[in-house]
Amino acid sequence: MRANKKSFQEERHIRFKELTMRETIGFIGAGNMGKAMIEGICQNHVFNTVWVCDHHQENLDVLHEKYGVKTSLSEIEVAQNSDVLVLSVKPKHYPKLIETIKDSVKSDVIIVDIAAGVTILDVKTYFGKNIKVIKAMPNTPALVLSAMSAISFDDLVTEEDKACVQSIFNSFGKCEVVEETMMDAVTSVSGSSPAYVFMFIEAMAD
């Protein structure tokens, strides 16, 4: 059984690597959702290199020890090294963060926005230039690698870029492509429904 499991993991690794030529993903912010995404990506070897920036050194130490990721306290260093850059911070921090990194990102970088209420247009406006942006909303079951994520693409994103990002979100659950106009509704339903299910289970247990 152990050999079969290893074979399955190897097949997943091959399949993910066939989806993208991008080698490095970076995370700015390593809260619960960021950690869940990092775990799925590292377990499935979606990228050769994972960079993580966080203001709490203890978070970085844990992630480095557990997954071997590269860590930094500098947002700029992570931005400079990332082919795909996930902005995993609270919505209120987006303007200041992007102002810090906007001149440091690679020209063909894919920005992944996972902040509720921050649109693709908002991100482009903060960067002050036309840049590839993907809006994504994972939900809390990501913490047990069972997320149901919604993703939306801007017009600059290629088919290869789409496959790359879908491989990210499929690594810790499943994902569906939706129009960005539907993202608020998706957030309300998929973001809140797990909490209701947990309440049902707790009530039944009582």
Locations of the language-model features?
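Internal alpha-helical scaffold of NAD(P)-dependent oxidoreductase catalytic cores
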Residues: 122-132, 148-185, 196-206
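NAD(P)+-binding Rossmann beta1-loop-alpha1 motif at the extreme N-terminus of oxidoreductases
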Residues: 20-71, 77, 146-147
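Rossmann-like NAD(P)(H) cofactor-binding subdomain of soluble oxidoreductases
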Residues: 67, 75-80, 84-87, 91-151
